[in-house]
Regions:
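SAM-dependent methyltransferase catalytic region
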Residues: 23-24, 28, 32, 40-312
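Long recognition/docking surfaces used for binding and targeting
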Residues: 1-45
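Conserved small/polar residues in nucleotide/adenosyl-binding loops
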Residues: 313-317
Length: 317
């Protein structure tokens, strides 16, 4: 985590307006993080980029999805502030490292209040979708700059959740979100951290093997597991990876995927000539999103999907 911390300190000390002056004119891109990361990953590890399905999402697409989610929250869920909503709900959650025979899973429960509109990007990448959500929410505070500082700490950061598997993307996401929040005038506390975690969204946990890096991974996994277990995610959005030859074959996600291998509303096997495509990573991320929305009893799933989603019979499942 020191890489993220040190990089963030460098950006805090820099005059970013001078750094960014003329950027778009020189690169024909408006996002410096994407410009850096695309070039870096293409040169450093193009095979990993292909294997992980890591591709740039056009800003216009990101803006459209975030704007649409905001409007649906207002129109269909009766939340006038949309993505900026501050309402809370009461939930019951398990307490880690507790044992209590009074509960079926052996864990003590506690009742807590948590924000209703929780956002999750399970394939965060460089943080483009979460950053766009921050920008759109900030626009709602036009002329109310004095309220922004308190709002971010109390009502925004606790609702922004992200999972990312690649260390480079994870680092860039933290830098981007720190940068965009600073640009809005927000001043972060020293002990404050973003809820973007280094983890595989399609797995349940990492075991701590004792090394310093493993301990770091364990802390990240614990943060992600808290979201997977206890957070009532209402909005799942992003651009998950596509990979027909998926390497994500963990027991948890494959068990969830069994629901997609049956004819709709039956227990009959899916009648598909080549059903292996249901195991594409993007299908698994759709199932992950459905898992969160189902658990919350309501919500929005807003992904950029492979075009085959609209063309293959498999998608009917």
């Amino acid at each position: 985590s020191w890489i993220v911390d040190d990089s963030a300190e460098i950006f805090r000390a820099a005059d970013m307006r001078q750094v960014m002056a003329g950027f778009g004119h020189r690169t024909q891109q408006t996002d410096p993080m994407i410009h850096f990361y695309e070039d870096f990953l293409a040169a450093y590890d193009p095979k990993q980029r292909k294997n992980r399905g890591v591709w740039y999402t056009p800003q216009a697409v990101v803006s459209c999805i975030v704007k649409t989610v905001d409007e649906i929250l207002q129109a269909e869920f009766n939340l006038p502030m949309g993505l900026a909503d501050t309402s809370k709900i009461t939930v019951e959650r398990s307490i880690d490292q507790s044992k209590d025979k009074r509960f079926s899973d052996g864990k003590k429960k506690e009742t807590v209040k948590i924000h209703k509109v929780q956002l999750l990007d399970p394939a965060t990448g460089t943080g483009t979708f979460l950053a766009e959500a921050v920008s759109r929410i900030h626009d709602k505070f036009n002329g109310q700059a004095g309220m922004w500082q308190g709002y971010v700490g109390e009502h925004l950061l606790p609702r922004l959740n992200g999972f990312e598997l690649l260390m480079t993307s994870y680092t860039m996401a933290h830098l981007k979100l720190d940068w965009i929040l600073t640009e809005t005038g927000y001043k972060a506390d020293d002990n404050e951290r973003l809820r973007v975690f280094l983890t595989n969204s399609l797995e349940e946990h990492h075991k701590d093997t004792g090394t310093l890096f493993a301990q770091f991974l364990a802390r990240e996994a614990n943060g992600a597991n808290e979201i997977k277990r206890n957070t009532p995610v209402m909005v799942v959005l992003g651009n998950p990876p596509y990979s027909g030859e998926s390497k994500n074959k963990g027991e948890w996600i494959m068990r969830l995927m069994e629901d997609y291998k049956k004819e709709p509303d039956t227990n009959q096997p899916l009648k598909e000539r080549n059903p292996k495509w249901i195991n594409d990573d993007y299908c698994k991320f759709i199932r992950l999103g459905q898992f969160f929305v189902d658990r919350n009893n309501e919500g929005i799933l807003a992904y950029v999907n492979n075009h085959s989603f609209c063309l293959l019979y498999t998608s009917d499942a």
